[in-house]
């Protein structure tokens, strides 16, 4: 039934809004909805072809009804496509402002997936097939958009070097906090000196010095 696939895209978009990350791009579903739009457009042209530009809806109510249904289906599919891509674009911009490098996160995830799959390459008898780690959760257009938006944001932030425009608008409750290191990040320079971020270590640091690292997933704030 026309419109069902477009509704699936809307459901994906709604779920994306409640996630902290960006789920995989629905390439096949988007292509199928776009193909449905083209098919409906061909149906419109086929229905209008016999009239050679002199169609009168009052004289051909059945044809007029078919044209209306096809046209409304096309418009709805287009709105679903636009809504899906708009939500993903807003999520990319949100992650960019939080300082999360989506492309770098994908590469790290892909490397982990590849390592986990090596042990099971010879176990064909199980019939299980893992997802390729090389698959990107972004479309090529989204990757390009993220790079260009990141560059634009960096240029914009460069005008105010003394102000962190991507920082939280809410002041921290405590000036210093306890954190646990989730991933090795090496040494970082802070106002109070150099701290070494080694995985599983716990530190008592100034909130402003590690706020970005918490957002990027390197650190976890302890209650």
UniProtKB/Swiss-Prot annotation:
Keyword Nucleus on entry: yes
Polar residues bias: start-end ranges: 122-139
Residue ranges of the region described as Disordered: 110-142
UniProt cross-references to Pfam families, sorted A to Z: PSF1_C, Sld5
InterPro entries to which the protein is assigned, alphabetical: GINS_A, GINS_bundle-like_dom_sf, GINS_Psf1, PSF1_C
Presence of the UniProt keyword Signal in the record: no
A GO-annotated cellular component: CMG complex
Cellular localisation: Nucleus
Gene3D superfamilies registered for this protein in UniProt: 1.20.58.1030
Biological process (GO), any one: mitotic DNA replication initiation
Protein role: The GINS complex plays an essential role in the initiation of DNA replication.
Family: Belongs to the GINS1/PSF1 family.
PANTHER family hit by this protein: DNA REPLICATION COMPLEX GINS PROTEIN PSF1, PARTNER OF SLD5
Protein name: DNA replication complex GINS protein psf1
Organism: Emericella nidulans (strain FGSC A4 / ATCC 38163 / CBS 112.46 / NRRL 194 / M139) (Aspergillus nidulans)
